[in-house]
Amino acid sequence: MRYNQFSYIPTSLERAAEELKELGFDLDLQKTAKASLESFLRKLFFHYPDSDYPLSHLIAKNDMDALSFFQSEQELSKEVFDLLALQVLGFIPGVDFTEADAFLDKLAFPIHFDETEIIKHIHHLLATRCKSGMTLIDDLVSQGMLTMDNDYHFFNGKSLATFDTSQLIREVVYVEAPLDTDQDGQLDLIKVNIIRPQSQKPLPTLMTPSPYHQGINEVANDKKLYRMEKELVVKKRRQITVEDRDFIPLETQPCKLPIGQNLESFSYINSYSLNDYFLARGFANIYVSGVGTAGSTGFMTSGNYAQIESFKAVIDWLNGRATAYTSHSKTHQVRADWANGLVCTTGKSYLGTMSTGLATTGVDGLAMIIAESAISSWYNYYRENGLVCSPGGYPGEDLDVLTELTYSRNLLAGDYLRHNDRYQELLNQQSQALDRQSGDYNQFWHDRNYLKNAHQIKCDVVYTHGLQDWNVKPRQVYEIFNALPSTINKHLFLHQGEHVYMHNWQSIDFRESMNALLCQKLLGLANDFSLPEMIWQDNTCPQNWQERKVFGTSTIKELDLGQELLLIDNHYGEDEFKAYGKDFRAFKAALFKGKANQALIDILLEEDLPINGEIVLQLKVKSSENKGLLSAQILDYGKKKRLGDLPIALTQSSIDNGQNFSREPLKELPFREDSYRVISKGFMNLQNRNNLSSIETIPNNKWMTVRLPLQPTIYHLEKGDTLRVILYTTDFEHTVRDNSNYALTIDLSQSQLIVPIASN
């Protein structure tokens, strides 16, 4: 374990003493440091009628227990304080450590003993993470140190778990959206599942916009998947044009219906544990799936601003600007009289994507988004540089396949009976509009590109993204983060994992940092919390997070690739082609071992190479035919210890998100030896070699200059490392599988790898 503590708010002595007193730690500022520490420790054992007993189970020195120490005349020293602090946080002498000083250095322990600062040290200790993954104060509250009185209690600028999660209100409302996406002449109704604590105070809301939450249709999804085996189409030379079109909602009328009291209820919905954490701290949770999902009406428009509007309508309702009904019969309306109107959205992948889309509307009431692994341009999710390009792990998927997966209205037999014919018509229109034949950018994709509206974002923004996420690739967060207005508060956590959540990792206090931010933004708490704009997980060692100023630098280093002419054959033998098509993982294994069709260049680094931004391959290329696709991957190659990309569970249920509520495992990325690490990758239709809007011809056997931008990253290579460049054509995971007999030739003498270099 290593501490990377970003959530602690430095506090004055007076404020620290006041907050400790509010918790029941009545520490006399006139007492000695030793007496104050003893008083604090005894309070920790509030379950015991006699605190001597648990105190005797701690050691103050290698040859003295804590009870004996406090009964002695010996003075409090750094060694005693450190040893006791470690034990209070759950670290066991002789098991987790033998030499306390060395262990503290390894931990990067954030508290440095000064006898005159004992009150501030105790305050800081309470806000510091235990071995279990919870802060000490959260651990104590989870054990019942504070009663669940359904009121707010704060410590170090963060809300504590004092809301009763055993008496939650669970209700359903149906919000009227200014849409008619299925064109039935009726405004669409949006189902909203609400979970909120009982409280006399207006509550802020965490809203998870999740098209998955009302169920998914995997059978329809699998039937809709596309075969990837097809020839790469030769496209006509042309220029693509699109236009920015404002989304115009339909008109709605003020509701004059009586207020209803009898709301639909529910017992369970699959929740997000970060939401659960805040539910116990006085934040209502709502789950909304939007148009075209079970319980709602309308068509699943998948990514455009009509879908975004269906979530926006819910925020409007929370602020009194839209109508919600008690049921589909629309006989009574219901108002969000429990809400303070301030909303933060949460969730990963499609959920985080909807958060980004919502933020670009500038809707009033949306105070903050926490968007994890989020898409900012749907074209860049299903296409790349004029190519059909599947997200990592999902060959054959496209946006209409996702529509089939998430159109959960068809899981309700009655809805299927009444509406499936119309749904199939609209789905067919969507399938035609996305133009899988060419892979080109068009108006359909432009209408699903949130980047063009990034200037309208006015809420606070928090993004998390994995630099090993080949599903929602790093370009998605790179482009939106760098497009955000300079006037807003923005934060980015870049980790070394893949498509995963990070709120329950051991090495980063993400949960507590979000608590401090949300108390500021949604509860109006003046806590003086300041979070760095960008925090990056160091790839060279375990559990080390660093502040970064920018994602993408203008300083570059050009690396020569060699002097040879390299030939890349596109064609595989029939058996090999079928085997790779059946299992793209077998293709990847062969590719990284140099066994698949490829041009391979190894560069031994003579100095450190701190990459920050978008690597570009500038290549001199020619094709034997009038078509060609180019794929590239950059590897950190050779056996050494690296971070894994999937977090593993260190404990099974040590994190309590309330008071015995929604327990979850503590996780972390492992650090272990492997043979390589993908740093970046990229794909291009050579007919789109200059830009996305220009379709050009490929002259047979004529040299072309190609700039292939790879996925942005921040990655540190060290002197002596091997950087491996792999150039090839068909990628069996991502691209169409064209097995035609053509070849690409690369002139390495006129080619370079252009690397953006991080400054110190």
Curated annotation (Swiss-Prot):
Record InterPro entries: AB_hydrolase_fold (IPR029058), Galactose-bd-like_sf (IPR008979), Pept_S15_Xpro (IPR008252), PepX_N_dom (IPR015251), PepX_N_dom_sf (IPR036313), Xaa-Pro-like_dom (IPR000383), Xaa-Pro_dipept_C (IPR013736), Xaa-Pro_dipeptidyl-ppase/CocE (IPR050585)
Listed GO CC annotations: cytoplasm
Keyword field contains Lyase: no
Keyword Lyase among record annotations: no
Gene3D superfamilies: 1.10.246.70, alpha/beta hydrolase (3.40.50.1820), Galactose-binding domain-like (2.60.120.260)
Subcellular location, principal: cytoplasm
UniProt GO BP: proteolysis
EC main group: hydrolase
EC number: 3.4.14.11
Keywords tagged on the record: Aminopeptidase, Cytoplasm, Hydrolase, Protease, Serine protease
Function text: Removes N-terminal dipeptides sequentially from polypeptides having unsubstituted N-termini provided that the penultimate residue is proline.
Protein name: Xaa-Pro dipeptidyl-peptidase
Gene of this entry: pepX
